[in-house]
Amino acid sequence: GLGDVYKRQEFYLDEKAISEELRSYMEELARLTPKLTVRKSTEGAEHVPLVRVLRSDGSDSGLAFHGVPGGHEFTSFIMGLYNVAGPGQALDGETMGRIKALDAPTDMQIFVSLSCTMCPELVIAAQHIAALNPNVRAEAYDLNHFPALKETYNVMSVPCLVLNGEKVLFGKKSISQLLDTLEQQEQKSRTSDRPEG
């Protein structure tokens, strides 16, 4: 069952009430699932509270959730754990090949609300890619708790995807559509890095 594939979690807190909510949420989840261990970290982390998904050896998987992964994002969170633990959700060979071929460092920030029904598809797709490719990070944010980020990226609706802190895209995407976007982004950065002559 799913209980056999849970991995470790690390959570970062501050003094806000949402941090206390995250702490009790994660501790309760760990009580219900013996294969899941959580540890609180005080090392500097941006945009707290957050939960990082760690591999069984304690290394960072590139997956994180900023806020409390409840509401519609509970499923995304569980699928993230499942995909990091391996073998994860089944993918066809072509999709797996496309994921493995991504070689540029890519940072995906996915802004969501817990009541959004279209957000989980994008979060699951992004985190599935990150779980399989160490060059990719996928961090979801409950936008209600991060108004400064909402303003920085002028987020008008969710889901909202920010690539490498620059490119802002709105709307849900399947894993195939997201790979199209990431491949175009890589192609564009390769072209712009090429010396003129």
Where do the PLM segments sit?
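Long, charged amphipathic helices and adjacent flexible linkers at domain junctions
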Residues: 87-102, 193-195
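Short, small-residue-biased leader/transition segments that mark boundaries at the very start
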Residues: 1-6
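Structural micro-motif
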Residues: 43-63, 147-164
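Non-catalytic, surface beta->alpha helical segment in thiol-disulfide oxidoreductase systems
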Residues: 55-87, 162-197
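The canonical Cys-X-X-Cys-His
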Residues: 116-119, 161
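Thiol-based oxidoreductase modules, predominantly thioredoxin-like and allied folds used
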Residues: 14, 34-45, 134-148
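Typically the conserved alpha-helix immediately C-terminal to a functionally engaged Cys/Sec
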Residues: 19-30, 120-132
